[in-house]
């Protein structure tokens, strides 16, 4: 879309709603037809890799115009903090806003509390008169929208060009972050920026004159993910208490 129209904003929206389309397929298969969620997720992941390679084959190597940075001149010149907090693109600042909105939505609003109730016990939520399937459909579609935004960021900002399998398994790190953050928005945000810092580290280490193999630096975010998951898995009681009790379970309404 960015190549054809020259509009980065339109490309972001197309990417986001492409994520919604794939999420809708997942929702229909798992919520309506009660397919196994893990197997369906893996199948759609493989399908997505192949489909994106097919569609993007004619765009390989074409450089894109990156999204403009939103900089405030007098703030961007502040030592250390200026470069760290100011002069980023729109999606970076949108991520800050979404973290706050997600935390507020889940803890302070009625729809957010209903969503949490469905996650904790779909049978109890159904008994109270809430439409479990509707809530789950909306949650899955929203997740697809955010995943699409993340994919758009990779190809329009992080590396403004298209390359096959450019995600390099980052989605699995995102999945691990949910466990790392014990299903709490603030903790997940901390983990996301922590792993993001580790990812960016590989781009700066060699510039600092540190002699470390680039292959090892590329592996580092995934190694860190495995190490963190092993460490937090030691506290199984805490994870079990925070994890929604109905997560991954098919909903079959009582007749």
Spell out what each predicted region is.
Residues 2, 49-65, 147, 151-155, ...:
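Juxtamembrane/transmembrane-helix interface segments of polytopic membrane transporters
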Residues 5-6, 32-34, 108, 134, ...:
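Helix-loop interface residues and adjacent transmembrane-helix termini in multi-pass membrane transporters
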Residues 6-51, 194, 199:
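Alpha-helical transmembrane segments within multi-pass membrane transporters and channels
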Residues 12-13, 158-222:
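Transmembrane alpha-helical segments in multi-pass inner-membrane proteins
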Residues 48-108, 209-217, 244-255:
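Transmembrane helix-bundle core of multi-pass membrane transporters
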Residues 49-53, 94-105, 143-150, 174-177, ...:
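Hydrophobic core segments of alpha-helical transmembrane domains in multi-pass membrane transport
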Residues 84-162, 185-190:
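Helix-loop-helix "hairpin" substructures at the membrane interface of multi-pass membrane proteins
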Residues 102, 120-127, 131-134, 205-255:
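Cytosolic-side transmembrane-helix boundaries in multi-pass membrane proteins
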């Amino acid at each position: 879309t960015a190549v054809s129209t020259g509009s980065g904003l339109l490309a972001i929206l197309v990417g986001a709603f492409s994520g919604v389309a794939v999420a809708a397929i997942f929702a229909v298969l798992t919520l309506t037809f009660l397919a196994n969620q893990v197997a369906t997720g893996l199948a759609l992941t493989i399908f997505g890799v192949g489909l994106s390679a097919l569609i993007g084959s004619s765009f390989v190597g074409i450089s894109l115009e990156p999204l403009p940075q939103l900089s405030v001149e007098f703030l961007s010149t502040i030592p250390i903090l200026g470069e760290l907090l100011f002069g980023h693109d729109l999606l970076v600042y949108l991520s800050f806003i979404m973290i706050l909105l997600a935390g507020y939505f889940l803890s302070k609003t009625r729809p957010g509390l209903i969503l949490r109730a469905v996650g904790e016990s779909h049978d109890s939520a159904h008994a109270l008169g809430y439409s479990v399937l509707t809530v789950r459909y909306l949650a899955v579609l929203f997740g697809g929208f955010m995943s699409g935004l993340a994919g758009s960021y990779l190809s329009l900002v992080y590396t403004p060009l298209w390359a096959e399998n450019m995600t390099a398994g980052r989605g699995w790190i995102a999945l691990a972050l949910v466990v790392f953050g014990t299903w709490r928005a603030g903790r997940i945000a901390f983990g996301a920026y922590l792993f993001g810092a580790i990812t960016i580290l590989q781009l700066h280490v060699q510039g600092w004159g540190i002699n470390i193999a680039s292959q090892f630096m590329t592996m580092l975010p995934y190694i860190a993910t495995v190490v963190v998951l092993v460490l937090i898995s030691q506290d199984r009681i805490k994870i079990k208490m925070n994890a929604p009790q109905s997560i991954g379970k098919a909903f079959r309404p009582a007749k």
